Amino acid sequence: VAKKIIVIIFSVLIFNACSVYSSYYSYYPVEEIKTLAIKGTIKNGDSKNSPLSSISVEDKRNLNGKKHKLTLLNNSIKLVKDGKEYIIPYSNSNNYEDIYIYIYKNGVNIINGDFIAYIGKVKLDTGEIINLPPLHFKKEILVENYNPILDTLNQNTTKKIFDGLIEDYEKRNKY
């Protein structure tokens, strides 16, 4: 009986002691657009120094499960980073419901800091046209803690540690 208790206590300690921190980086506009979800995706989302891969624009009504098609009315967007302007061509040749603007594939390498995107006009499937203002993007970080052993056993152990601007996270964790 004593051996079983020791094994149980030891198992509980091992299962609870194994935790892993994971970080995911992305860019979001400072200004929220009421009807659209806009995000900058990093090429390797768990690496702080990975370049911006793409900017996606999605209709927030998609959250109910039904997809709503968006159309970018411009054939390019403009990015401004550190005073330099970049023109990124856009084509919806794949006929996606959402808008994907490929930044890195078009030779623009944004790794750190913020930037401004001039996306222009977006047409909803209702016919409404939204003229997006210049959007100021900043890099954000999502830090989570989870137990891989318990997650394997279908126990959701993920805890959100931080979700916000990378500058705020770095200030918070400075010793």
Where would I find each of the regions flagged by the language model?
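Sec-dependent bacterial lipoprotein signal peptides
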Residues: 1-20
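Bacterial Sec signal peptide processing site at the extreme N-terminus
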Residues: 17-35
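Short, solvent-exposed mixed-charge patches
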Residues: 20-21, 173-175
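Detector for glycine-centered tight turns/loop "hinges" at secondary-structure junctions
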Residues: 27-28, 32, 65-67, 82-86, ...
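Short, ordered beta-strand-loop transition motifs
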Residues: 30-33, 45-51, 92-96
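Short, surface-exposed binding/anchoring microloops in extracellular/periplasmic proteins
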Residues: 40-77
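Short, solvent-exposed, Trp/other aromatic-anchored flexible loops in extracytoplasmic proteins
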Residues: 83-142
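Short beta-strand elements
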Residues: 127-172
